[in-house]
Amino acid sequence: MQRLDPWHGRCDLQFHATNGSTKHQGGCTAPFKLLRSERGEDGRCELPVLHTAGGLVGGDQLSLDFKLEANSRGLITSVAAQKVYGSIGRSRLQPEGCFAHQQVRCSLASGSDLEWLPQELVLYADALFEQQLTVTLPQDASFLSAEIVRLGRTAAGETLQQGRWRSSLTIQRLAGESSTWELADRVELGGASLESPHGLGGAPVFGTLVWAAPMAMGAETTASVLEGARADREGLTGTMRCGALNQGLIARYSGESSRDARFWFSRIWERTRTIRGLTRPRIPRVWPLQEQPLRRQTSTVNAFEAAAETH
């Protein structure tokens, strides 16, 4: 039986600021494809990335490398949910299965601002997936990411079964020749941890938002941001917790609804813009049109309405 080589897709992008707006250059290889970028109200380059293969199988690799020059601003998202198909027991050559891998590297220069907001990751039964997100940035740069994973196709009555999901997230602050860790986070979900009360407790959805702020916020500002993020949980289901980093915050979601995770993270995303005096975020055009996570209930700042009823 002939063994096919795994697919390795690459996406290398550079962002540079000019005349108050940010432009990108670079390119990608199959299965990646770049769609038309848009200019945000703050001059930010908003760029959707399409994965044309329709999903990942064991052995596939994705490598994304983003470099932001001084004072540039970017928002990168995916066009659709990423699917990872089952691997265990699918091959006579490797009945134990093989991990698919994704590695994202982000390098930010002084005064730059990157928002990495991919759509949901869906692991099918017996899927094996490992992801790495590595960020380096100076003290005055901003990085925000929000990633959500669904472990099993819940609507079809499916669980992850023997599958596993691994995640490594590291954020390193650079100051001349020295550096400090803003965050070093490693998570592995599979087996007993899916049902354990010390793991997901049977919840199929897990998400993490992290923001490395471009300024020292101080105790009072940090407490205010966290209080607001906790208030943003109103009307949403699931377990939602948040806490402070040295210079930023981290938020976790676990529950039944990827929509509620997305709504909560979107509201925190808006807060990270507001605290810096930036324009309200604009929901990317490739996100589900029926959802309006930032719609306000009243004119009161940071009061929101979850418009969609489906999960």
UniProtKB/Swiss-Prot annotation:
GO terms for molecular function: nickel cation binding. GO terms for cellular component: cytoplasm. InterPro entries: UreD. Transmembrane segments: none annotated. It is found in: Cytoplasm. Belongs to the UreD family. This is Urease accessory protein UreD. It comes from Synechococcus sp. (strain CC9605). The lineage of its organism: Bacteria, Bacillati, Cyanobacteriota, Cyanophyceae, Synechococcales. The gene is ureD.
